[in-house]
A protein has these predicted regions:
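Glycine-rich FAD cofactor-binding loop and adjacent beta-loop-alpha segment at the N-terminus
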Residues: 2-89
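Conserved N-terminal helical subregion
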Residues: 3-5, 70-200
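Hydrophobic "anchor" residues on beta-strands that sit immediately upstream
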Residues: 10, 35, 174-176, 308
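Intrinsically disordered, low-complexity terminal tails and inter-domain linkers enriched
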Residues: 42-58, 100-104, 137-170, 242-257, ...
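Conserved FAD-binding catalytic core of PHBH/FMO-like flavoproteins
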Residues: 172-285
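FAD/FMN-dependent oxidoreductases across multiple families
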Residues: 242-347, 351-356
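C-terminal helical "tail/cap" subdomain of flavin- and related membrane-associated enzymes
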Residues: 337-427
Length: 427
């Protein structure tokens, strides 16, 4: 069976965690042959050039990402190890500044509640990409775009590699997976008119492995573990005008008292027990919008071509629940299983192969649409409703009820594995 020529050609377009994870998950699931993993290049539908890719990589390199316990299981299953980072062993949810005014007064979820080693891990973008790239390319071949390569050179290299691959007959199907970039001009948007101040702050009093999600009247605030016990990663959301004003205040400099003014405001937003010592000057203001493709699968039987969008190419979420990356990794995991099943059907030489393949892809789309839209609706409503008076007044009472053991366990499991079927995907 191994010698039977394949009738499906695969290409993975992307340079980030989504593309690299899909490549590695395909290998883990038993994919035979080349996955077609390639760097971004200039193509007709407006995807980024090599020069733009290098600029994007530079800006992303130090960005902190929160991986859930489920995502860590997936990464370990397909690479054999975990990327270096800082474990989240405890997550505290607080609503309002009065109902929970100090550390420990909110809903506290611990890794021991689910007998896990951690509820999640905070890693940098570059660390995660390097980890997946190293594991995906055991022979030393890197997917990183070499510095100085012009877009047309990159296109020529890709064309040469295409010509060197196994020749497929005219009846071959071509499957392209778009795993990075923007959901596109036609993406559906949900705009809560919020921006976030993101970056490193210096604190004292934070328990080891502790993460905070605090829903305040002007927007959600999150603290995540960082490189040292004296620092944490801040995500401070508010309406766009207020966030931009806060950043301008910081940029005024010490002479105008800008940093001290922002420190005072942030101290008022943090719970008692967390002493804010300083702010990293590299804080940034990021506009927050949920953008998502309505369709993530396009099949053209006449051309025997399939396009699939996953991860950042399919959706970008508001960070209120910290689940965007985890959703993208679930996209990759389910697509890997689907594609390997399609290849197995080819190897077996089953009849009605095209119909079976289309059916499997449609089933993948159905599963992913259910998962992604459920999570997007949750994050959309949290971002929009959490600043409303009724939420600030009533939700603290609901949070007290959530401290009951069974309900708390459900919430903890949802945080760790997402609002979907049981994990991990791989037994």
């Amino acid at each position: 069976m191994r010698g039977k020529p394949l009738m499906t050609r695969l290409e993975i377009h992307g340079h980030g965690p989504g593309a690299l994870a899909l490549h590695r998950m395909l290998q883990r699931e038993g994919w035979e042959g080349d996955t077609g993993l390639r760097e971004r290049q200039q193509v007709s539908d407006g995807h980024t050039t090599a020069k733009a890719l290098q600029a994007a990589q530079a800006s992303l390199a130090t960005r902190s990402l929160a991986l859930s316990a489920g995502s860590l299981q997936l990464i370990k299953a397909c690479t054999g190890s975990l990327p270096a980072g800082n474990d989240i062993t405890c997550v505290e949810v607080q609503i309002g500044a009065h109902a929970a005014s100090a550390v420990g007064e909110g809903l506290v979820m611990r890794h021991s509640d689910l007998a896990l080693e951690q509820l999640g891990r905070v890693v940098s973008w570059s660390t995660l990409v390097d980890h997946l790239d190293a594991k995906a390319m055991p022979r030393g071949r890197s997917t990183a775009a070499p510095l100085g390569i012009a877009p047309h050179d990159l296109g020529e290299r890709s064309l040469q590699r295409d010509q060197g691959t196994t020749t497929c007959s005219k009846s071959a199907w071509h499957i392209r997976v778009w795993a990075d970039g923007d959901p596109g001009e036609d993406a559906l948007e949900e705009d809560a008119d919020q921006s976030a101040i993101v970056g490193r702050v210096y604190v004292r009093g934070a328990p080891q492995g502790w993460a905070l999600e605090r829903f305040l009247a002007d927007g959600p605030l999150a603290l995540l573990p960082d490189q040292s016990p004296q620092s944490m990663q801040l995500v401070w959301c508010a309406n766009a005008r207020q966030s931009e004003s806060r950043l301008r205040t910081l940029r005024e400099g010490p002479a105008q008292g800008g940093e001290q003014s922002l420190l005072r405001e942030l101290r008022m937003a943090l719970p008692k027990g967390i002493a804010l010592m300083g702010i990293d000057p590299g804080l940034q203001c990021v506009r927050l919008k949920r953008r998502a493709r309505a369709q993530i699968l396009q099949i053209c039987p006449e051309d025997r071509q399939v396009d699939v969008w996953i991860a950042n190419a399919a959706q970008s979420l508001h960070p209120v629940a910290g689940q965007g990356l985890n959703l993208g990794l679930r996209d990759a995991a389910e697509l890997a299983r689907c594609l390997v099943t399609i290849q197995h059907i080819e190897r077996q030489g089953e009849t009605a192969q095209a119909n079976r393949m289309i059916g499997l892809l449609r089933r993948f789309e159905e599963h992913r649409q259910r998962d992604r839209w459920l999570l997007m609706r949750i994050t959309d409503q949290l971002a929009r409703q959490s600043t409303r008076f009724w939420f600030q007044a009533l939700a603290p009472q609901a949070l007290k009820i959530a401290r009951q053991s069974q309900l708390k366990r459900f919430i903890t499991r949802t945080f760790a594995f997402g609002p979907r079927e049981a994990w991990p995907i791989w037994a």
